[in-house]
Amino acid sequence: MANEKFGKGIFMKMLLGIYKKPLQVERIFMFLDLKSSTTIAENLGNYKYSQFIQDAFIELNEVVSKHSASIYQYVGDEAVLVWTFKSGLLYDNCIKVFFKFIEQLSGKKDYFQEKYGFHPEFKASVHGGKVIFAEIGTIKKELAYHGDVINTTARIQSLCNQYQQQLLVSETIWNVINSKKQYDSQVYLDAYLKGKNETLTLFGVQKIGDLVS
């Protein structure tokens, strides 16, 4: 379980107590959030909505390991993926995983529509930088990331609707993506993030030929 969540070798290091002392690491995060979640939940009710989310995240699991990602958290109808910088930038995994997930869901559109009357669509943000990685808790131990990078990634995702973009990527990450020619991108200068004093430059990213939803 720990290997799936944080990467290979983490569980053994946890047993050895290595993470009891906080470590500074560099990570890339993706925050994935279900579009129109309130409307879907109100129509389906709690039980069927939970099944809907389960089915959607089964499709996510189909693509995560193929793109060297770990699922850090599920929070309601949101999932948080994490990579080391090396694994996230290799083959542009931190970008490609989103579009593969969308393709996976598209292939199951009829299934979702027939079973639930809705098909899941997601929006996402990608950002990265230095965070603290540490073991927390005593009765229930957990490994957790802390730092402004995580908060910033969440704030970026909250702008997807405003900019009418499925995927927003920070300048920090977009500048080091190798295969930019595979994508269409739109730059947003001086993007204001709630609770932040400084603005950021963001990029709305689509596969070439895709229309902004």
Residue ranges and their predicted role:
Residues 22-93:
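Catalytic NTP-binding/metal-coordinating core of nucleotidyl cyclase/transferase enzymes
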Residues 1-25:
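Regulatory cytosolic signal-relay segments
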